């Protein structure tokens, strides 16, 4: 029996950071630091598959903190995510990394929710920062990106933008920061029938 395309109906937001004095070439921050960031984000035992940025309307109101979902995690399962994550080396002059994910929801001409879009943000800083700087920069750049996604599609904003952010001040050689949405539950659209 055929079935249509799959779409998520439950998501969680999470974030993590990692740092290390050790790493393996060619991108040393992609090994130990990335694993530590996944561990802090509580998604270290998933096989991570990245998405682009389109959200079905069924996710509206169904994005929760990661701690509400942990009991449903399955070791070794595939986790589809929208993730803003990058690493850096202090030897390159980066001493802090901020990451964020923003969400906008759009409506049709009748005011009905049609779905949403996400945007990712990563910024490198030459000095240490604090949470206020990380949050304000994330909101500034994500707001611009989310509005662009709506304008590009000639879609009107349905509700307030949502923002999630994270940051690291790198104290060791390498650091990594990530902010992510993970998708857990799914349904299927009606199958296509071509006559």
Curated annotation (Swiss-Prot):
- Sites bearing Pyruvic acid (Ser), chain numbering: 53
Q: What EC number(s) are associated with this protein in UniProt?
A: 4.1.1.19
**Keywords, A to Z?**
Cytoplasm, Decarboxylase, Lyase, Pyruvate, Virulence
Q: Does the keyword Lyase apply?
A: yes
Principal localization reads cytoplasm
**Quick one: signal sequence residues?**
none
Q: What class of enzyme is it?
A: lyase
Annotated site (Cleavage (non-hydrolytic)), which positions?
52-53
Q: Name one GO molecular function term.
A: arginine decarboxylase activity
Catalysed reactions listed for this entry: L-arginine + H(+) = agmatine + CO2
* GO terms for cellular component: cytoplasm
Q: Which cofactor does it need?
A: pyruvate
The source's domain of life comes to Bacteria
Q: Tell me the Gene Ontology biological-process terms attached to this UniProt entry.
A: arginine catabolic process
The places in or outside the cell where this protein is found are: Cytoplasm
The note on cofactor binding and number reads:
Binds 1 pyruvoyl group covalently per subunit.
Q: What does this protein do?
A: Part of the AaxABC system, catalyzes the decarboxylation of L-arginine. The arginine uptake by the bacterium in the macrophage may be a virulence factor against the host innate immune response.
Question: What family does the database annotate?
Answer: Belongs to the pyruvoyl-dependent arginine decarboxylase family.
Q: What subunit structure does UniProt give?
A: Trimer of an alpha-beta dimer.
Q: What is the protein's name according to its record?
A: Pyruvoyl-dependent arginine decarboxylase AaxB
Annotated source species: Chlamydia caviae (strain ATCC VR-813 / DSM 19441 / 03DC25 / GPIC) (Chlamydophila caviae)
Q: What is the lineage of its organism?
A: Bacteria, Pseudomonadati, Chlamydiota, Chlamydiia, Chlamydiales
The primary gene name is: aaxB
């Amino acid at each position: 029996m055929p079935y249509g395309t799959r779409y998520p109906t439950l998501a969680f937001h999470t974030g993590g950071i990692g740092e290390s004095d050790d790493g393996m070439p060619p991108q040393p921050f992609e090994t130990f630091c990335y694993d530590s960031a996944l561990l802090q984000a509580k998604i270290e035992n998933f096989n991570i598959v990245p998405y682009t940025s389109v959200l079905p309307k069924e996710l509206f109101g169904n994005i929760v903190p990661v701690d509400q979902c942990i009991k449903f995690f399955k070791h070794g399962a595939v986790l589809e995510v929208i993730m803003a994550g990058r690493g850096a080396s202090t030897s390159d002059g980066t001493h802090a990394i901020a990451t964020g994910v923003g969400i906008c929801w759009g409506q049709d001409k009748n005011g009905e929710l049609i779905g949403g879009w996400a945007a990712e943000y990563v910024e490198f800083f030459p000095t240490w920062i604090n949470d206020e700087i990380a949050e304000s920069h994330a909101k500034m750049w994500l707001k611009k990106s989310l509005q662009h996604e709506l304008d590009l599609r000639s879609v009107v904003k349905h509700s307030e933008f949502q923002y999630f952010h994270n940051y690291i001040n790198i104290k060791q050689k390498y650091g990594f920061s990530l902010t992510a949405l993970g998708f857990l539950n799914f349904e299927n659209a009606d199958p296509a029938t071509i006559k």
